[in-house]
Amino acid sequence: MPAPTQLFFPLIRNCELSRIYGTACYCHHKHLCCSPPYIPQSRPRYTPHPAYATFYRPKESWWQYTQGRRYASTPQKFYLTPPQVNSILKANEYSFKVPEFDGKNVSSVLGFDSNQLPANAPIEDRRSAATCLQTRGMLLGVFDGHAGCACSQAVSERLFYYIAVSLLPHETLLEIENAVESGRALLPILQWHKHPNDYFSKEASKLYFNSLRTYWQELIDLNTGESTDIDVKEALINAFKRLDNDISLEAQVGDPNSFLNYLVLRVAFSGATACVAHVDGVDLHVANTGDSRAMLGVQEEDGSWSAVTLSNDHNAQNEREVERLKLEHPKNEAKSVVKQDRLLGLLMPFRAFGDVKFKWSIDLQKRVIESGPDQLNDNEYTKFIPPNYYTPPYLTAEPEVTYHRLRPQDKFLVLATDGLWETMHRQDVVRIVGEYLTGMHHQQPIAVGGYKVTLGQMHGLLTERRAKMSSVFEDQNAATHLIRHAVGNNEFGAVDHERLSKMLSLPEELARMYRDDITIIVVQFNSHVVGAYQNQEQ
């Protein structure tokens, strides 16, 4: 249990910050100790427990934030200039265009844009993109970590290898295994498309390789060598489940290297959701574990945009997930397995990698912690056992896989962590990306909804829309453009530079209270190639 001073000083500091910025303070005991009134917009993945939570406060909406500042006794201005805003927004952006052959792009994917905007320090989100070299297709994914970034980092490095191996034919697996045994160079199976900030752990590479090799050896033994078509859905499910199993096993076995031993335990005790797309020609598979989302942007005949959801959130808002959990455990746990819209009253996503506190037996948890390094044994969170923990596992990493056959009207796919979906409706996301890609945004009338707008306000909105053209041209990345809207949109749906500047100026200790990490990948499809596939079949 943290010492009283450890609980006291964070509380005092955040109360002081709330007075400086005019915001409500939601303290460790969940008492509102500062004005103005506070209504949470969204909740974090973990509900605090006195055993390991010293301070907790959910995010507020921007409206509550600005209202609080409006009446602050000493208002403080901290505006970033447009170049400074752009520097922050573009720091993590990455774009990839599929290369052409003989002046033609024969892939159903034109390319993709990705970007990240941190709220946590360090950011807990991760992203990955790679082209499969020994099989057809491209893999793209976003990973949302919680209780730290260790698990999301490991999954972002490893999952695509497990998927690629699961898709390989028997003869290719044999060729790779023979190359390892004879010390020859291995066939490359993935070509990564990475931002310079997207790193791989060199220290853990050998450990990860050995676990992956054990997996493909088992696949070789299971396969008789007969040429059979590989089921992509089954391959995705097997890859997700096997990686999660390896994460758990590595933590149980440990490692002689003290650094690696602590690393595998950090990975296992933290958690991550994953939303991965595999695109092969017109075949699009989305494998989702958790509450990140995949959204398809469809352009209708009249030029309007519609959003098609290709994933389901695995949380309390999904009645099928709640029912699944209740059916997997005894009836006397029906009221405790999902409590306050959380798994065992603690965890928001009902599916995730890692999070062994919701998977291992109590005896196994105690045994691993007691034999682990001091950092783990001294950590109050790892020693805390969830309440009503009777029949584990309560959590799974098994993905829900959705299949969609691409059509010419399917223009793009948005993969994003929940930091985006908490701030924007799916239809707005698709419309903004669609208008950005087609340059049609300026033709849309201004929508004011039920707001009463004066002539002066309307003039301001028209001025903003004119200025919006320049922001589109300065954004060379669709994901960056979407983040700009997610963080800077006002109540009329236009980017407000003052608001955007304020949100990006928040200090680290306040940023997480108003938004989450945001990670986005926008995949643009090649309508001509997709249409050619369709014509060939007809």
UniProtKB/Swiss-Prot annotation:
Belongs to the PP2C family. The lineage of its organism: Eukaryota, Metazoa, Chordata, Craniata, Vertebrata. GO terms for cellular component: mitochondrial pyruvate dehydrogenase (lipoamide) phosphatase complex; mitochondrion; pyruvate dehydrogenase complex. Its EC number is 3.1.3.43. Its main location: mitochondrion. Residues 1-71 form a transit peptide. This is [Pyruvate dehydrogenase [acetyl-transferring]]-phosphatase 1, mitochondrial. Mn(2+) 1 binds at D144, G145. It comes from the Eukaryota. InterPro entries: PP2C, PP2C_BS, PPM-type-like_dom_sf, PPM-type_phosphatase-like_dom. SUPFAM superfamilies: PP2C-like. One of its GO terms (molecular function) is [pyruvate dehydrogenase (acetyl-transferring)]-phosphatase activity. PROSITE patterns: PPM_1, PPM_2. It catalyses: O-phospho-L-seryl-[pyruvate dehydrogenase E1 alpha subunit] + H2O = L-seryl-[pyruvate dehydrogenase E1 alpha subunit] + phosphate. The keyword Oxidoreductase does not apply. It is an enzyme of class 3 (hydrolase). Keywords: Acetylation, Calcium, Hydrolase, Magnesium, Metal-binding, Mitochondrion, Protein phosphatase, Transit peptide. It is found in: Mitochondrion. Binds 2 Mn(2+) ions per subunit. Binds 2 Mg(2+) ions per subunit. Mn(2+) can substitute Mg2(+) for catalytic activity. Magnesium-dependent and calcium-stimulated. PDP1 activity strongly depends on its Ca(2+)-dependent binding to the lipoyl domain of E2 subunit of component of the pyruvate dehydrogenase complex. One of its GO terms (biological process) is dephosphorylation.
